[in-house]
């Protein structure tokens, strides 16, 4: 019934999209498999997810829970601005064989944008090795088009970041 009063009496009604996400995503299972195989076919050995908070927590939990699947790239999550962690991650991957996923609902979150710019420069400004996951109409969508990212996946605007685990933010 999407009764927002069960949670709060504020603006919660505009953030209840997570209640419908499971059936919607179940219809997309083939799309997710296709993405995985396309990434595999391109020969990537690593995937670095660049995000903060809700945009990166679920992928990190999935990675830690299920590990790497044989024959597919290893997932690394960068959600720290500590320069030592950024450099440590950079040293663990072959940048020429790494796919970068920039995850930001608003597209204007400072940390993922800084991470994106750093690795975009370090990878020779090759947008074909970047994917964006962002809400429609965001600044990140504009950047992804301008820099010719390989793909843009869209979040559901009615799902808040902390509830985005079962949307494309968690599933891609």
Describe the role of every protein-language-model region.
Residues 1-41:
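Extended, charge-enriched "interface" segments that sit outside catalytic cores
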Residues 34-171:
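Glycine-rich phosphate-binding loops that contact phosphosugars or nucleotide phosphates
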